[in-house]
Amino acid sequence: MQHFRPQLQRTLRRLGRTLLALYLLAIIGGLIADQYVQFRQSDAETQQFFANRQQPIYIGYYNTQQRQMRYIYTEDDASKPVILFIHGAPSSSSYFRDYLSDTNLRKAANLFAVDRPGYGYSGFGEPEPSIAKQAAMIAPILYQLHKQSRPVLLVAASYGTSIAARMAMDYPQLVDGLVLLAPSLAPGQEKTYDVSYVLESTFFSWAQPRMIHSANVEKLTHRQQLEAMLPYWKNITVPVTYFQGADDELIYTSNAAFAKQQLINASELNVHMLPGLGHLIAFKARPIIVPAIVNMLPKAAQYFAQRKQDVVQPQLTAVLPAATSTNRQ
């Protein structure tokens, strides 16, 4: 027995050293990844992307609830309706850059995309788990746009659809239509990876990439946030178009049935399940989605014309900049 004790001790020491080395490697890997995997574009990179396509782009910032928010937009023509794109997780406004450069969309509307709280340049790595608070942080853009009396259509993907739906619930006077891509609407009807819990543990949370931290915080609180929204689905009265890949394994297709059950007061609901596609339909089904967005604009305009509610302007420390005072390429 005594013969095996030193051998066991050596084995345990080797195991301990191996685990420590793996832990340190994971920490170093996370810190390196944080610098190179951010899914965002700086102002200069954004301007260069559109300059390469010989298209103008504007970049704006505003402050709300102790946070600076960034958004990008193609133009601010009062004669056109507005489309605001809201990205999922992890991501940023650059997720929709191919939509903002689409010539058909640019002709039809003013195109805006916002960095959600915790992503891009809206407090990168500082997540806001409350869907209601995120909606409130994005709402100032809509208040400013509605001052010129024009319809606003929200186009959102994945987690961003939860935000868009909450905005239609809480700010019915500001939203005139929804286009939801790979929607995450039903509590618990999405895949959560076990690694999300590990990464948010005490041992790893401080060293994981900031972008992943924002996504994990949202993921682990998403069910609770969606449950809090259950009483308010009846408040959505705008026209809604729903797209999802029939083979989506990240957001379960049961969300489509949930949408049909809950959006009973929507003026119109069209659900499209795309065969052979998974979660990333915003990229793979863009030729289908872009015409659908354009077709939603007259419906949003009709809804806007019928709406007679007053808009109350919130307190802002900065407002939508004029095109002449914003960087342009």
Q: What are these model-predicted stretches?
A:
Residues 16-61:
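An N-terminal hydrophobic leader/cap segment in hydrolases
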Residues 89-101:
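The serine-hydrolase catalytic nucleophile loop
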Residues 104-123:
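Conserved alpha/beta-hydrolase
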Residues 135-150:
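Conserved acidic catalytic loop of the alpha/beta-hydrolase fold
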Residues 162-165, 169, 178-204:
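Flexible "cap/lid" loop of the alpha/beta hydrolase fold
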Residues 236, 242-244:
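Short beta-strand/loop motif that positions the catalytic acidic residue
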Residues 249-255:
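Conserved alpha/beta-hydrolase "acid-adjacent" motif
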Residues 277-286:
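Catalytic histidine-centered segment of alpha/beta-hydrolase-like enzymes
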